[in-house]
């Protein structure tokens, strides 16, 4: 039996101006895995995330966290936000304290933990995100990538079960993208945290994500593992997305250059293995 940490049932959300942002969303998020939410701008990804941790309340339908409907009382929402943390796309919207230590400790202080526990959690969060050396640095002196790590540490300090990140790789150079994604996967594997990301960086999805949901106009139109989702090439392109670059290359080799592949590979490692297998078969024949 599958273990789902979040279950979304017929979720609808309407903004006060009448915008119907989410339309009958049904979604199950597996515990302890990395899930990607894909879709163009304005499809409802951020609205969905804000429903996940109680910033917004569904117009209809419901969300279950740990198999229990979300409790929208003040106490229930405070508890929920300790368990489901959000890291926004722009860390400047999340950092507001004078120093890194003050900012990272904010959530733990609000939980009314003891000073010793706060210090312990902050030190652990700083170590986990590899920013111990920035502990006393003013937040306004940080690079964009450093600010991203501080924002993640500020959520980690509350020891959440779910970490939601809106465009975690936006604004980062290639090395920064690789480092931040490896950090997230490390936390998922070592701490058992469920990671949910919204991203336009298609190439990271087959490398780091276990499950994928594709949204269009407030609805989920595709779901599955990366190979299952990107196999639906026409649907992917109709919603203004694309295949991962390696997947596109393998598609071209098959359709235009006579290569014979059983399935669409999406990563360099997968493609190398398939091409070597094809090459060996040709030479042996």
Swiss-Prot record:
<keyword id="KW-0547">Nucleotide-binding</keyword>
<dbReference type="InterPro" id="IPR027417">
    <property type="entry name" value="P-loop_NTPase"/>
</dbReference>
<keyword id="KW-0472">Membrane</keyword>
<comment type="similarity">
    <text>Belongs to the ABC transporter superfamily.</text>
</comment>
<dbReference type="Pfam" id="PF00005">
    <property type="entry name" value="ABC_tran"/>
</dbReference>
<dbReference type="InterPro" id="IPR017871">
    <property type="entry name" value="ABC_transporter-like_CS"/>
</dbReference>
<dbReference type="GO" id="GO:0005524">
    <property type="term" value="F:ATP binding"/>
</dbReference>
<dbReference type="InterPro" id="IPR003593">
    <property type="entry name" value="AAA+_ATPase"/>
</dbReference>
<dbReference type="InterPro" id="IPR015856">
    <property type="entry name" value="ABC_transpr_CbiO/EcfA_su"/>
</dbReference>
<dbReference type="InterPro" id="IPR005876">
    <property type="entry name" value="Co_trans_ATP-bd"/>
</dbReference>
<feature type="domain" description="ABC transporter">
    <location>
        <begin position="6"/>
        <end position="242"/>
    </location>
</feature>
<dbReference type="GO" id="GO:0016887">
    <property type="term" value="F:ATP hydrolysis activity"/>
</dbReference>
<keyword id="KW-0067">ATP-binding</keyword>
<keyword id="KW-1003">Cell membrane</keyword>
<dbReference type="GO" id="GO:0042626">
    <property type="term" value="F:ATPase-coupled transmembrane transporter activity"/>
</dbReference>
<dbReference type="InterPro" id="IPR003439">
    <property type="entry name" value="ABC_transporter-like_ATP-bd"/>
</dbReference>
<keyword id="KW-0813">Transport</keyword>
<dbReference type="InterPro" id="IPR050095">
    <property type="entry name" value="ECF_ABC_transporter_ATP-bd"/>
</dbReference>
<feature type="binding site">
    <location>
        <begin position="39"/>
        <end position="46"/>
    </location>
    <ligand>
        <name>ATP</name>
    </ligand>
</feature>
<dbReference type="GO" id="GO:0006824">
    <property type="term" value="P:cobalt ion transport"/>
</dbReference>
<keyword id="KW-1278">Translocase</keyword>
<dbReference type="GO" id="GO:0043190">
    <property type="term" value="C:ATP-binding cassette (ABC) transporter complex"/>
</dbReference>
<protein>
    <recommendedName>
        <fullName>Putative ABC transporter ATP-binding protein CPE0195</fullName>
        <ecNumber>7.-.-.-</ecNumber>
    </recommendedName>
</protein>
<comment type="function">
    <text>Probably part of an ABC transporter complex. Responsible for energy coupling to the transport system.</text>
</comment>
């Amino acid at each position: 039996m599958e273990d789902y940490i979040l279950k979304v049932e017929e979720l609808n959300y309407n903004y006060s101006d009448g915008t119907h942002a989410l339309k009958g969303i049904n979604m199950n998020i597996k515990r302890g895995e990395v899930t990607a939410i894909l879709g163009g701008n304005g499809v409802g990804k951020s609205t969905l995330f804000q429903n996940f941790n109680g910033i917004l309340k569904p117009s209809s339908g419901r969300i279950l966290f740990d198999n229990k409907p979300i409790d929208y009382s003040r106490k229930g929402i405070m508890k929920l936000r300790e368990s489901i943390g959000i890291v926004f796309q722009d860390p400047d919207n999340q950092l507001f304290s004078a120093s890194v230590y003050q900012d990272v400790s904010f959530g733990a202080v609000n939980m009314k933990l003891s000073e010793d526990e706060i210090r312990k959690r902050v030190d652990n969060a700083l170590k986990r995100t590899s920013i111990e050396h920035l502990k006393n640095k003013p937040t306004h002196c940080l690079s964009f990538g450093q600010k991203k790590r501080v924002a993640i540490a500020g959520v980690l300090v509350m020891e959440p079960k779910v970490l939601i990140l809106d465009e975690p790789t936006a604004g980062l150079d290639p090395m920064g993208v690789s480092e931040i994604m490896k950090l997230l996967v490390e936390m998922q594997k070592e701490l058992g945290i469920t990671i949910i990301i919204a991203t336009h960086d298609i190439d990271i999805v087959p490398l780091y994500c276990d499950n994928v949901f594709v949204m269009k106009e407030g609805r989920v139109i595709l779901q599955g593992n990366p190979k299952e989702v990107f196999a639906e090439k026409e649907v992917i392109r109709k919603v203004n997305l694309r295949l991962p670059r390696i997947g596109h290359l393998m598609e071209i080799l098959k359709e235009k250059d006579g290569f014979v592949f059983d399935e669409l590979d999406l990563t360099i490692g997968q493609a190398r293995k398939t091409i070597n297998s094809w090459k060996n078969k040709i030479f042996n024949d």
